[in-house]
């Protein structure tokens, strides 16, 4: 007897998702590219062109003809998946399947899998219900978080400090990794496009589900837009109301760090000029020409220092009043090399733990303590 097909609630927890061997999104590649459950694979039962053709038949001829043509294509595509991606799956393989509404596309694959003998599950309501669950999570989970913002001028290695803290066991939320962007004018990653807004939100939802209630979570100060990605309103509100630890560093240390951290741009200076053109409304033609001259001469230390002092630092100062009102302490860097970053991470972890337990702590930590 074929095993029954199980219907799964769209608000399935991350822990329950891990109980399945494979999460299969049977929607078209274009639908999958816009958003999907993180970790899912795309085994479409109709590709983009086929889906469009069946939709046209449905509207211009009649639903019966469309369903018959669609069923033939779905059967062919599922057969192709069984002969390729799924050919080595064992008897006890447990897939979780979803389509747009949890109807015909996922149902067709689940029925065939069940007839084979696989215990298949389908997300009730499909992606549409899953998306509502994500939006609900992004609305209410941030209100339960205990965030600690790590702020500081551009070039103070905040992202590296957070990742060093994570390696030491501190819980963090790395928005720049999720957004595939460093959150500044020169923050785009060459050859690595940003995710769609929806997929960013799906990833963030999973991260938030892993946050333990009452646990202090470190997160880098960001604007409400990271590249093309918008930080969800409730999460942004939680960030704006969270206490802050500020990182300071000498200008020369910041310049040296940025030259190392943005080596991909130093090696490809042609990538920088189109980005600088976005500053025409903020800086004079004379200043832009001076920056271009530094780039042409590959005078990276002077270029970086000038960009910091003329553009980034004034922008940071303009946002200072609200940030200072929430500031709970300062950690002072010296060199921003590997060892210094690790010491800063430990100092921030100590300060954050002290604040969380309401213990008195010094207002400043030196990175070499």
Residue ranges with predicted function:
Residues 104-105, 146-166:
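Glycine-rich phosphate-binding P-loop
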Residues 72-124:
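Catalytic cysteine-centered active loop of the rhodanese-like fold, especially the PTP/DSP P-loop
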């Amino acid at each position: 007897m074929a095993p029954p097909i199980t219907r799964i609630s769209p608000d399935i927890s991350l822990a329950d998702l891990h109980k399945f061997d494979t999460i299969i999104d049977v929607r078209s590649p274009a639908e999958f590219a816009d958003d999907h459950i993180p970790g899912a694979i795309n085994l479409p039962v109709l590709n983009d062109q086929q889906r469009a053709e069946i939709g046209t038949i449905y509207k211009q001829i009649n639903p019966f003809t469309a369903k018959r043509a669609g069923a033939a294509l779905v059967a062919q595509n599922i057969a192709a998946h069984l002969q390729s991606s799924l050919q080595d799956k064992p008897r006890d393989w447990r897939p979780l399947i979803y389509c747009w509404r949890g109807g015909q596309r996922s149902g067709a694959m689940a029925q065939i899998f069940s007839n084979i003998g696989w215990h298949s599950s389908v997300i009730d309501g499909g992606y549409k219900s899953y998306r509502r669950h994500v939006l609900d999570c992004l609305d209410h989970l941030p209100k339960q978080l205990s965030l600690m913002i790590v702020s500081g001028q551009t070039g103070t290695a905040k992202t590296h400090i957070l990742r060093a803290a994570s390696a030491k066991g501190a819980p963090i939320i790395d928005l720049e990794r999720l957004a595939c962007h460093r959150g500044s004018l020169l923050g785009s990653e060459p050859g690595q496009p940003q995710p769609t807004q929806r997929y960013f939100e799906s990833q963030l939802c999973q991260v938030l589900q892993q946050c333990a209630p009452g646990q202090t979570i470190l997160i880098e100060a960001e604007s409400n837009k990271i590249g093309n990605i918008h930080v969800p309103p409730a999460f942004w509100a939680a960030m704006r109301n969270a206490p802050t630890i500020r990182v300071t560093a000498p200008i020369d240390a910041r310049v040296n760090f940025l030259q190392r951290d943005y080596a991909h741009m130093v090696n490809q200076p042609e990538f920088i000029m189109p980005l600088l053109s976005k500053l025409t409304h903020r800086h004079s033609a004379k200043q832009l020409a001076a920056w271009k001259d530094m780039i042409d001469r590959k005078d990276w230390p002077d270029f970086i220092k000038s960009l910091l002092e003329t553009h980034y630092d004034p922008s940071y100062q303009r946002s200072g009043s609200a940030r200072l009102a929430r500031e709970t302490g300062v950690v002072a860097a010296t060199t921003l090399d590997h060892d210094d970053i690790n010491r800063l991470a430990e100092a921030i972890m100590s300060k954050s733990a002290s604040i969380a337990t309401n213990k008195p702590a010094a207002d400043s930590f030196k990175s070499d303590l």
